[in-house]
């Protein structure tokens, strides 16, 4: 009976089901019971918990009988589960912080609503001013629907009547203060109308007589309440737009500022000096009604103060030091030169670039726009050009890394990237996409004409190539073919100093190519000896001359430290292709030099040290006779003697006729 075979032949129906009694029910706590089966053979307990554990019943909506075949007791329902405790009540919201009335007024209009096409800006007492002819009108009348490009608010400001005269008066009285008397008057009058101080970047409203602090937002509150959008920085003379929330650049305003400063400095340098300046100010006051003493409500502006600031007469906005990020002096000196080219300055500060790249963060022209804004922001702390360096590494991989690089190589690389990223800004008007007229080509691109003359038939083959700079060989024992250099002394005489003009003459001389470099003539169709001559077919606006001071002859590498003199003014007429053609035709040369061939020295980049270990610095001209020395983060005023005695590696000349415009 205990064997496996006997257990398989047994039938469960032969075992009678005992009736439930109190003996075969086992208590399981909480009043629930479980039926206990009678003792049966071990072979029949195939469903015992020791052999096969009982499956856990699936949860159902209602409990059913747990007996087999409808026999047995129903299990009582389980006790109801306790409901979860309610979540804690959230803490009450903090009370709103009480703000000042000025703060609420400055944040009230987050999105400007529709504005009228024209509006009139009045002075603080809402009175009207009269011109010198007696006609009554507002101080400035602004039309907000003008100006499609650049800052539309500046364009609207220029629509107003007498805006040039009023702006010129502000520059004369409050910005270009050249004499002790004018500086004294400025220290007394130019104070904040709200806090009565002059230390927090004082700005003057261009639409009325109001001075306010920029740091403490007093000028912002005035602009918010009066809708006067433009103000001028009294320290640097730059214009701030409250609608654009940035400093803006305008060519017409810049011209007025420059003319006013030149006029004042010219009067101060005259023999009469202060008297001429005072006479000018008196005449301007008679013609204009824009004066701090004209209104009773603004008499607080002219109260004398014990403390007053000192104002230097040199205008140095734009000259800002650049941090050296690790052997990046070659980049810093090129950036200082590029940011002071007048046409580039006008282009980038006027926001004329239209980025067409899918990733504007990789556009070098967009980064240069931000760099120009940082250089002309008036901030005197050195700028960190890390983003510019990163983009150069991306687009010019041969310059990646913190190794020492060549400044001339970096100049060509950055001009090439700027040219590629700004092609959409200046396509030729005729629709020829092959003829690029971008800002880089417009300023730097010239053309070299190469003439190959056959020695047999005298046929000339001409090739014209564009160029961004001109590399000039230096005289000396390291230059091929210079054994009889003009630097050698003869008969005990002192050697003559080589100039930039001598290098240009050597560059444009006819060169015999020799028998080892025979070229097939296009006319006689035979390989013959020929001569080669380079001339300038087209002159650029900014001419860059590269003095080749680094030479590699076999395994030898050396730097040529020969002194090369360079003039402040340069005439490029003798080196033009048209001049050569006139000489060959026997035509007389005119004594009058065309204005487009005259150049003025604009910047000089110097290399100090050896070929293996060196450093780059630059001299940059701001005005006619004002030169500054830029050595990474240090910018100082330089003398003409320091400039002309420098060694010279890259020389930048600007066309005089365009520079004067």
From Swiss-Prot:
Gene3D superfamilies membership: Cysteine proteinases, Zinc/RING finger domain, C3HC4 (zinc finger)
Recorded superkingdom: Eukaryota
GO biological process: DNA damage response; DNA repair; DNA repair-dependent chromatin remodeling; protein deubiquitination; proteolysis; regulation of cell cycle process; regulation of double-strand break repair via homologous recombination; regulation of double-strand break repair via nonhomologous end joining
UniProt keyword list: Chromosome, DNA damage, DNA repair, Hydrolase, Metal-binding, Protease, Thiol protease, Ubl conjugation pathway, Zinc, Zinc-finger
Keyword DNA damage attributed: yes
Entry's EC annotation: 3.4.19.12
Protein name: Ubiquitin carboxyl-terminal hydrolase 51
Species this protein is from: Mus musculus
């Amino acid at each position: 009976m205990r064997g496996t075979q006997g257990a398989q032949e047994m039938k469960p129906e032969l075992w009678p089901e005992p009736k439930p009694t109190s003996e075969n029910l086992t208590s399981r706590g909480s009043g629930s019971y479980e039926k206990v089966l009678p003792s049966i053979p071990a072979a029949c307990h195939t469903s015992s918990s020791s052999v096969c554990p009982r499956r856990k019943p699936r949860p159902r909506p209602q409990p059913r009988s747990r007996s087999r075949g409808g026999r047995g007791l129903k299990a009582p329902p389980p006790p109801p589960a306790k409901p979860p405790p309610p979540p804690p009540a959230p803490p009450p919201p903090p009370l709103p912080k009480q703000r000042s009335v000025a703060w609420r007024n400055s944040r009230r209009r987050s999105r400007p609503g529709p504005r009228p096409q024209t509006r009139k800006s009045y002075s603080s007492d809402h009175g009207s001013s009269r011109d010198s002819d007696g006609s009554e009108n507002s101080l400035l009348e602004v039309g907000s629907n003008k100006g499609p490009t650049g800052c539309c608010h500046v364009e609207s400001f220029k629509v107003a009547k007498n805006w040039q005269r009023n702006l010129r008066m502000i520059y004369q009285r409050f910005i270009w203060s050249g004499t002790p008397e004018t500086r004294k008057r400025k220290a007394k009058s130019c104070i904040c109308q709200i806090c009565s101080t002059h230390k927090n970047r004082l700005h003057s409203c261009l639409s009325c007589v109001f001075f306010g602090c920029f740091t403490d937002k007093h000028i912002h509150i005035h602009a918010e309440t009066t809708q006067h959008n433009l103000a001028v920085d009294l320290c640097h003379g730059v214009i701030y737009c409250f609608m654009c929330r940035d400093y803006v650049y305008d060519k017409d305003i810049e011209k007025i500022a420059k003319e006013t400063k030149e006029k004042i400095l010219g009067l101060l340098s005259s023999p009469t000096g202060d008297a001429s300046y005072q006479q000018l100010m008196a005449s301007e006051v008679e013609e204009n009604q824009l004066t701090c003493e004209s209104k009773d409500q603004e008499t607080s502006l002219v109260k004398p103060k014990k403390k007053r600031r000192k104002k230097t007469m040199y205008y140095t906005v734009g000259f800002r030091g650049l941090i050296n990020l690790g052997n990046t002096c070659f980049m810093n000196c090129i950036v200082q030169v590029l940011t002071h080219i007048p046409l580039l300055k006008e282009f980038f500060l006027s926001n004329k670039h239209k980025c067409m790249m899918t990733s504007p963060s990789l556009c070098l022209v967009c980064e240069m726009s931000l760099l120009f804004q940082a250089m002309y922001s008036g901030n005197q702390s050195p700028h960190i050009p890390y983003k510019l360096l990163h983009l150069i590494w991306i687009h010019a991989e041969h310059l990646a890394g913190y190794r020492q690089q060549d400044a001339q190589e970096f100049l060509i690389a950055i001009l090439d990237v700027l040219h590629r990223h700004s092609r959409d800004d200046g396509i030729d008007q005729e629709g020829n996409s092959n003829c690029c007229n971008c800002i880089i080509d417009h300023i730097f691109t010239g053309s070299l004409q190469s003439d190959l003359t056959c020695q047999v038939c005298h046929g000339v083959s001409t090739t014209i190539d564009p160029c961004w700079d001109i590399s000039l060989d230096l005289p000396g024992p390291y230059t091929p073919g210079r054994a009889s250099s003009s630097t050698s002394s003869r008969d005990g005489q002192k050697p003559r100093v080589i100039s930039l003009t001598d290098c240009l003459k050597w560059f444009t001389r006819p060169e015999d190519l020799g028998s080892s470099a025979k070229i097939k003539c296009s006319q006689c169709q035979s390989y013959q000896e020929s001569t080669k001559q380079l001339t300038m077919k087209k002159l650029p606006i900014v001419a860059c001359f590269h003095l080749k001071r680094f030479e590699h002859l076999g395994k030898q590498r050396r730097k040529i430290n020969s002194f090369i003199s360079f003039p402040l003014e340069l005439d490029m007429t003798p080196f033009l292709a048209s001049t050569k053609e006139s000489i060959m035709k026997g035509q007389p040369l005119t004594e009058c030099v065309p204005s487009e061939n005259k150049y003025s020295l604009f910047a000089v980049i110097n290399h100090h040290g050896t070929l293996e270990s060196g450093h780059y610095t630059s001299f940059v001209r701001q005005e006619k006779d004002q030169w500054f020395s830029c050595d990474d983060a240090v910018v100082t005023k330089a003398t003409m003697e320091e400039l002309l005695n420098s060694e010279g590696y890259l020389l930048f000349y600007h066309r005089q006729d365009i520079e004067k415009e």
